[in-house]
């Protein structure tokens, strides 16, 4: 077994916490960074900058440096809210250029088997936004997974009694896929072909 210095071992451990990074990738990344101290310094500084400056928007719960975020403070359709699971899903929707409304990030999906309940998500905050009476449509853009579908159904049951139109992305997106990995054209077709729930 190879023994590394304490600091390198710690770096490897931290890198392996990233999604999709195992032992080999962590080692490759660590040695790449060590070859170029300037890159290592720049990475460390950018991580500290993100930690200090990036937060969640108090309106949509997307990622921002300004509060409210750019999408919440610009002139977009204020009558439509697109509900997504994670902040990166906003990027997928924006790449399509098909959606012109506002967003709401749940920060997950319902998953009773994993202990994720409505109280763990930003559902209460969504319902509070809907109380204003200005919202005419909620587009549910949760992932097409069991958890995403369960979340969409749960939200539909909460929102329908408010006489707000509830729509879902069209099912042109493959079942079991995550929205953040879908190409812009497919997302655009899905937004244009959304259907009432």
Curated annotation (Swiss-Prot):
The gene that this protein is the product of is recR
List, in alphabetical order, the GO biological process terms annotated in this UniProt record: DNA recombination; DNA repair
Keywords carried by this UniProt record: DNA damage, DNA recombination, DNA repair, Metal-binding, Zinc, Zinc-finger
Q: Which HAMAP family match?
A: RecR (MF_00017)
Described function: May play a role in DNA repair. It seems to be involved in an RecBC-independent recombinational process of DNA repair. It may act with RecF and RecO.
Protein name, per record:
Recombination protein RecR
Recorded hits in NCBIfam families, A to Z, give: recR
Q: Which GO terms describe its molecular function?
A: DNA binding; zinc ion binding
């Amino acid at each position: 077994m190879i023994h590394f210095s304490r600091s390198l071992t710690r770096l490897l451990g931290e890198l392996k916490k990233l999604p999709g990074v195992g032992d080999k990738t962590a080692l490759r990344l660590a040695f790449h960074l060590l070859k170029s101290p300037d890159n290592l310094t720049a990475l460390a500084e950018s991580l500290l900058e993100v930690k200090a400056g990036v937060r969640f928007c108090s309106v949509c719960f997307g990622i921002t440096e300004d509060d409210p975020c750019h999408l919440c403070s610009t002139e977009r359709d204020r009558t439509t809210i697109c509900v997504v699971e994670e902040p990166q899903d906003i990027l997928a929707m924006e790449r399509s250029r098909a959606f012109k409304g506002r967003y709401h990030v749940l920060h997950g999906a319902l998953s009773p088997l994993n202990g994720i309940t409505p109280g763990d998500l930003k559902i209460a905050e969504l319902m509070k936004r809907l109380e204003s009476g200005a919202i005419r449509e909620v587009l549910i853009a949760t992932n097409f997974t069991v958890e995403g579908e369960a979340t969409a159904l749960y939200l539909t049951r909460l929102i329908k009694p408010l006489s707000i139109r509830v729509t879902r992305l069209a099912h042109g997106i493959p079942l079991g896929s995550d929205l953040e990995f879908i190409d812009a054209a497919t997302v655009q077709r899905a937004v244009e072909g959304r259907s009432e729930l």
